[in-house]
Amino acid sequence: LVPTPNAAPDPRNEETRGLLIHSATPVHNDARRLQAVLEGGVLLNGNSELVDRLNAIIYRDGTLPLGSKGTATLFLGDTRIATNVRLFAGERALGTRASQVVREHVLDEGKVWLDTAFVVNDYYVSGYEPVLDSYGERVGMLYVGFLEAPFSDAMQGALLTLFDDL
């Protein structure tokens, strides 16, 4: 785990759990009798392809203000296990954690977060949603967001232009 500003205290040093997509389907013979079960899974920890694809679908070219960037993250608990959020050195922010206020709202209370949030090292316009396991228990979060500053600057410029003409 990477020390993260505004995250809840956590005595752990590392994330030892895994989050995976698991699927199984029956295989029947011609007489419709069960012959086998085909089972498979994909470990989502470190799965950059998933968040990069999600990010590409949501934030197409030209949809954000100049200087902003779209981001997506999959959390196990409040820990980033797949993300395109970057640390200062440009590496993916794996092992960093969500802020305590987001964690409480989404994981503890089971609510969707649609607001500004501190994400690793800056403020983002953010959406977080609980990820549920097959028993309906909250096990993580899905996040998408974009840098707040370029959006705020563009909105402020638009408002100044609008009211300057009045």
List PLM regions with ranges.
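Envelope-exposed proteins and targeting segments
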Residues: 18-23, 34-36, 70, 122, ...
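Short, hydrophobic beta-strand elements of compact beta-sandwich sensory domains
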Residues: 36-43, 125-152
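Short hydrophobic alpha-helical segments used for membrane anchoring or interfacial signaling
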Residues: 64-67, 71-79
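Membrane-interface helix-start motif
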Residues: 147-166
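Extracytoplasmic/periplasmic sensor domains and loops in membrane signaling proteins
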Residues: 1-12, 47-61, 81-118
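Short, acidic, Ser/Thr-enriched surface-loop or helix-capping motifs
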Residues: 29, 75, 133-134
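Short acidic/glycine-rich beta-turn/loop cap or linker motifs at sensory/regulatory domain boundaries
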Residues: 31, 44, 76-81
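A short beta-strand signature within small-molecule sensing/ligand-binding domains used
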Residues: 3-10, 15-27, 111-114, 121-131
